[in-house]
Amino acid sequence: MINIRKTHPLMKIVNNAFIDLPAPSNISSWWNFGSLLGICLILQILTGLFLAMHYTPDTTTAFSSVTHICRDVNYGWIIRYMHANGASMFFICLFMHVGRGLYYGSYTFLETWNIGVILLFATMATAFMGYVLPWGQMSFWGATVITNLLSAIPYIGTNLVEWIWGGFSVDKATLTRFFAFHFIFPFIIAALAMVHLLFLHETGSNNPTGIPSDTDKIPFHPYYTIKDILGAILLILTLMLLVLFTPDLLGDPDNYTPANPLNTPPHIKPEWYFLFAYAILRSIPNKLGGVLALVLSILVLVIMPLLHTSKQRSMMFRPISQCMFWILVADLLTLTWIGGQPVEHPYIIIGQLASIMYFLIILVMMPVASIIENNLLKW
C-alpha cells in the first residue's frame, strides 16, 4: 500500500516540501537560516498574539498597558522580552540569510531572490511599526523622524506624511493604524514566505560550490530535518540567554520614558538592525538624497543578478571576490556603529566614507573583481 503522506492532498504538500524533497548533499550550516527565519516568524506571531490580548493602541494607555503586561500579566514579562529580542534574532538570521545568498550566488534564482527582497522590506516595515507601539520617547520620535522623511518626496510629500499620520503630527490615529498594520503584516510575510519557498522548490537549492547538484541529491528528511533541529535549539538557546539575562541589552533606555512631544531626546536612533541604513541616510546632507540613498541601500539587492560578471556562480573558488565580500561585511559593521553615534566629528566623515564604500564595493569593486578572476582563469 502506498504511503498516505504521498497521496493525501494536504500531506502531499508537506511531504514534497519537508520530507521527500531532494536536497543537495553538501549544503552547509549557512543553509539553516531559512528554517530559522520560519521559526522566528512563528515565534513572533505567537508572542505578538498574546501581547495584543493585553495591549491597548491608544496614546493615553499604550505605555501603561505595556507596563501592565510586564508587571501584572502571568509571564507577561517573558512574552514581551521574547517578542522584542525575537525581532533581533529575526534580523540576525535575515542578514545571515541574505549574506549567504550574496556569497554563494543564490540571487541567480530570480523569482526567489526578488520575493526575498520584498520579504526584507516587509519585515523592516513591520519591525519599525512594532517599535512605535510601546509609545516611549524613542517610539514617538523614531516614528516622527522616519515618517517625516517621506516629506522629501517632491510635490506630494507633505500631503503623504499627513495622510500617514492621520493628522498634523504623530498622534492617536498614527498609533492605532500602526498597531493594525503591525498585526496584519506578519501574516502577509508568512504568505510571501510560502511563495518564496514555492519558487525555491521549482529550481531546488543552490549549494556552496555553485555547481548544479542534480546528480547528487539526498532526501531532506532525516538529514536536514535533524540539522534544522540543531539550528533551532541554538537559536532558542541564544534567544533565551538574551531574554533571561540581558533583556534590555539591545533596547534603548529612552523607551522607558513615556512619549513626550514637547521633549526631544538628545540622540534619536532606531533599533540596532536599522543603524546601517540610518547611517547612510544621515551621511548625505540633502534630505531627498538621504532618503534615496536609504532606499537604494536595500534596493541595490534587486540588481545583484545584473552585477554578476563572473563565470562562476559561487564565491567559493574566487579569493578576490571573497576579500571584497568580507570588506563589505566590515563596512556594514562600521555603518552600524556610526548609526548609533552622535552627529559630530569624527563620526560624520567616517559615516560618509563608509556609505561611499558601501555603494562602491557593490556597484564597482565586486563586478571588477569578478572580471579580473575571469581573466586569471585563462592563465
UniProtKB/Swiss-Prot annotation:
Principal location: mitochondrion
List of residues binding heme b b566: H97, H196
Cofactor descriptive note: Binds 2 heme b groups non-covalently.
Cellular component GO terms held in the UniProt record: mitochondrial inner membrane; respiratory chain complex III
A GO term for molecular function: metal ion binding
Transmembrane segments: 33-53, 77-98, 113-133, 178-198, 226-246, 288-308, 320-340, 347-367
Residues engaged in binding a ubiquinone: H201
PROSITE patterns named among the record's database cross-references: CYTB_CTER, CYTB_NTER
KW Endoplasmic reticulum (keyword) present: no
InterPro entries per record: Cyt_b/b6_C, Cyt_b/b6_C_sf, Cyt_b/b6_N, Cytb/b6-like_sf, Cytochrome_b, Cytochrome_b_C_euk/bac, Cytochrome_b_N_euk/bac, Di-haem_cyt_TM
Keywords carried by this UniProt record: Electron transport, Heme, Iron, Membrane, Metal-binding, Mitochondrion, Mitochondrion inner membrane, Respiratory chain, Transmembrane, Transmembrane helix, Transport, Ubiquinone
GO biological process: mitochondrial electron transport, ubiquinol to cytochrome c
Subunit details: The cytochrome bc1 complex contains 11 subunits: 3 respiratory subunits (MT-CYB, CYC1 and UQCRFS1), 2 core proteins (UQCRC1 and UQCRC2) and 6 low-molecular weight proteins (UQCRH/QCR6, UQCRB/QCR7, UQCRQ/QCR8, UQCR10/QCR9, UQCR11/QCR10 and a cleavage product of UQCRFS1). This cytochrome bc1 complex then forms a dimer.
Protein name: Cytochrome b
CDD domains associated with the record: cytochrome_b_C, Cytochrome_b_N
Recorded topology in the membrane: Multi-pass membrane protein
Cofactors, names only: heme b
Function of the molecule: Component of the ubiquinol-cytochrome c reductase complex (complex III or cytochrome b-c1 complex) that is part of the mitochondrial respiratory chain. The b-c1 complex mediates electron transfer from ubiquinol to cytochrome c. Contributes to the generation of a proton gradient across the mitochondrial membrane that is then used for ATP synthesis.
Family: Belongs to the cytochrome b family.
